[in-house]
Amino acid sequence: MGVEKIKAAFENGKKAFIPYVMGGDGGLEKLKERIRFLDEAGASIVEIGIPFSDPVADGPTIQRAGKRALDSGVTLKGIFQALAEVRKEVQMPFVLMTYLNPVLAFGKERFIENCIEAGVDGIIVPDLPYEEQNIIAPLLREVNIALIPLVTVTSPIERIEKITSESEGFVYAVTVAGVTGVRQNFKEEIHSYLEKVKSHVNLPVVAGFGISTKEHVEEMVTICDGVVVGSKVIELLENEKREEICELIYATKQKEEA
């Protein structure tokens, strides 16, 4: 469980496809069913979003999914229970994407206990600055759950080194300045940014934010170790276009042979 399980997703040159699903969008049974589908389809890791009323890093698609989940009365406790149930059936690592407020409102210790029971392997907290990560990092380290760092295009290399020096799991490299969402293409400087991050950190580097097509996936995994696909996966699940998710997974895995 935990850090080692995430590490295994990248071993021997594997390229990781990491889909994002919003916890409770469509109900908790739907969450479990979607995780089972993604596991069977060959996803490497699944990222589960915790719905929050003020999601500052999320684009419109993920915001709408979070609102649907909150409007349906889904709770953090309910999401943990659903994950604990589906964990018995799937092997891929679970990574939670949560803002800090739900963690503090739930109680840090209680949150981590529930993570353990649900088989959570890593956590991303997009609004937790590096300078404040001791709020939760030592508690996670004690139980072998990875606190996964986010680095951005605007981060100086010294800061990237600092942020990632004590991190575990993988580095989430944000490929755009702004919120999540589908984009048409990536600028040339994104390539040099990802190459720079790769050359300065000792963890796998995963690109995320704005990745939505097979071409995007192929472009990104040529440079880094995997991709997170969020808004597009939510859209495809909502519209029952699951074969297109399988195509994105296939595009990722194809690059392992290269």
Swiss-Prot record:
Enzyme class: lyase
One term under GO cellular component: cytosol
Keywords for this protein: Amino-acid biosynthesis, Aromatic amino acid biosynthesis, Lyase, Tryptophan biosynthesis
Catalytic residues (positions): 47, 58
Catalyzed chemical reaction(s): (1S,2R)-1-C-(indol-3-yl)glycerol 3-phosphate + L-serine = D-glyceraldehyde 3-phosphate + L-tryptophan + H2O
Highest taxon in the source lineage: Bacteria
Known EC number: 4.2.1.20
Any one GO biological process: L-tryptophan biosynthetic process
UniProt-listed SUPFAM superfamilies: Ribulose-phoshate binding barrel
Pfam families recorded: Trp_syntA (PF00290)
Pathway: Amino-acid biosynthesis; L-tryptophan biosynthesis; L-tryptophan from chorismate: step 5/5
Keyword flag Lyase: yes
GO MF term set: tryptophan synthase activity
InterPro entries the UniProt entry points to: Aldolase_TIM, RibuloseP-bd_barrel, Trp_synthase_alpha_AS, Trp_synthase_suA
Record-annotated membrane-spanning stretches: none
UniProt subunit comment: Tetramer of two alpha and two beta chains.
Record's function text: The alpha subunit is responsible for the aldol cleavage of indoleglycerol phosphate to indole and glyceraldehyde 3-phosphate.
Family: Belongs to the TrpA family.
Protein name: Tryptophan synthase alpha chain
Organism: Bacillus cereus (strain ATCC 14579 / DSM 31 / CCUG 7414 / JCM 2152 / NBRC 15305 / NCIMB 9373 / NCTC 2599 / NRRL B-3711)
